[in-house]
A protein has these predicted regions:
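A structural signal for long alpha-helical coiled-coils and helix-turn connectors
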Residues: 22, 26, 116-119, 176
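Short, charged N-terminal helix-start/capping segments
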Residues: 27-39, 87-98
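Acidic/histidine-rich alpha-helical segments that form the ligand environment
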Residues: 78-125, 156-161
Length: 182
């Protein structure tokens, strides 16, 4: 099995987990929070897709589809939606847009096409990780940023992405269970 096939299989498993976790839920259940400062299933699903979009396009040196294809406008949301730390009020107010699945499908299609084109040597390529949206780059001569929680290579970023998305998928299952859905 090639590395990209392993990642594609992991993303397919994650997609099944998310479909099971979000399937059949009402808008109120997607918005339900186990605590006032906890993310809802809808917000977790939102983050999963946005993180995949950013990570896979950052390593290609491209803008995420969210910006490049103006999904933020299509979904009537700010360009920086879902980035950074949200206040409890922002978390409580979040509602997953009705057309979210269309954006999620576009992101996954883009990811699959990118991964299918990678060769084993491509995973070792170093990547300059841009600062998070809304955070300026460090000026020359300033203290170095804290170490990244992953190796800044194509492979390191993709593995970190898959791990982070899987953790959010587990949270979705937990919240679904808290609402009485198996």
């Amino acid at each position: 099995m090639e590395i990209n096939d392993l990642l594609l299989d992991g993303l397919e498993n994650l997609q099944r987990m998310i479909q099971k976790g979000t399937g059949g839920l009402t808008p109120a259940e997607l918005k339900w929070q186990p605590r006032p400062d906890a993310e809802s299933i809808g917000l977790l699903f939102f983050h999963i897709v946005r993180v995949e979009d950013m990570a896979t396009h950052d390593i290609q040196g491209k803008k995420p589809l969210w910006v490049a294809e103006q999904w933020y406008q299509k979904l009537n949301m700010p360009a920086d939606a879902g980035m950074g730390h949200l206040t409890p009020a922002q978390i409580a107010a979040f509602e997953l847009p009705k057309e979210w699945q269309t954006y999620a499908a576009a992101v996954r299609n883009s990811t699959v096409n990118y991964l299918k084109g990678l060769k084993s040597k491509d995973f070792d390529r170093d990547v300059v990780v841009p600062p998070p949206p809304g955070q300026p780059a460090k000026p020359a001569g300033s203290a170095p940023p804290p170490p990244l929680p992953f190796t800044p290579t194509v492979g390191g970023i993709l593995i970190h992405m898959l791990t982070a998305l899987s953790a959010r998928g587990g949270k979705i299952d937990y919240i679904r269970g808290r609402q009485g859905h198996g």
